[in-house]
Every structure is written in C-alpha cells, then in structure tokens.
Amino acid sequence: MYKWFIALLLSSSVALAHPLRLSLCEIEFYSKENLLSVNLKLFLTDVNEALVFDPYSKELAFCQPNEHSDADKMLMDYLNRFFYVKFNKKKIGLEIKKKKLSGQGDNTALWIYLEKSVEGKFDSMEIKNAVFTDLFYDQNNIVYIHVNDKSKSIMLNKETSTYELNF
C-alpha cells in the first residue's frame, strides 16, 4: 500500500511539472468582405523560447514601450515557418495588424491579430499550424475556422500539422 502511495505521489508531481502546451487560433473568412483574419493566442514564455531561446526573456518586450525594433520581424519569420493559410493551394501573406498581452506570469498570452485582403473564388483552404512543435513534442494547436456561414474546429500537432477544407 505504501509503495503505491509513493508511486502515485511521484507520478502526480511529475505531471504537475509539465505545463499544458497549447495555442489557440481563430481563422475567419467572409467572401462578401474579401478579408481573411487570423487571431492567434500564444503563451509569451513559448514565444520567447522560440525566438530567443529563453522563456523569461524581456529582450523582445512585446507590446511594451521598449519593444525591440525587430520583434515583429522575428515573430513573422517564425510564424512563416510554422503557420500558413492557403487558398486554392496559394499561400496568403498575412500581416500583423495588432498585438496585445493578457494574463500574468507564466499565463501571460500574446494575442496576434493578422489580416489580408483576398480576392476571387476559392475551392479549398489549407491550414498549417505547427507553432511550437519544433520545441515541444506534446504541443497542441486548436484551430477554429469560420468560412462564410460554416464553422469547424480542429486540433493540430507535431504528427498532424495541416488540415484542408474543400468548399
């Protein structure tokens, strides 16, 4: 009985030492407006680890008066490697419209709002969200997709990093 209690205690303390590896993404496209918008919610410690290899770095200072002059460029370089949206097999070049921070400490999130005007009739949309899968084997990325009047939610990760919708 005592050995089982110790084993349970050790296994639960190990589980508590591993944080939840998760990002949220909402993709919206309404053909009447010809606008693609993407909202990403990423934990700031994960962003810092991906960009400057230090989760608690204050070097980039996102959304602060002393934000590093290359912070947006570094962020977009990373996102362009691990995240994209394609219409009819053509990658859409997203641009940062705004960013904001929410939460405190390890729970501080960096919200990134990206947009791009797009024209034409679309038959397919492909999404890749492999953000932080280069750093964490257990990273999961939840994606909510809204196209005109249809919605879908998917979970992407290291093994399955892309998803295709056909209209």
Regions found by a protein language model. Name each.
Residues 4-13:
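Sec-dependent N-terminal signal peptides
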Residues 18-167:
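N-terminal soluble domains immediately following signal/targeting peptides that reside
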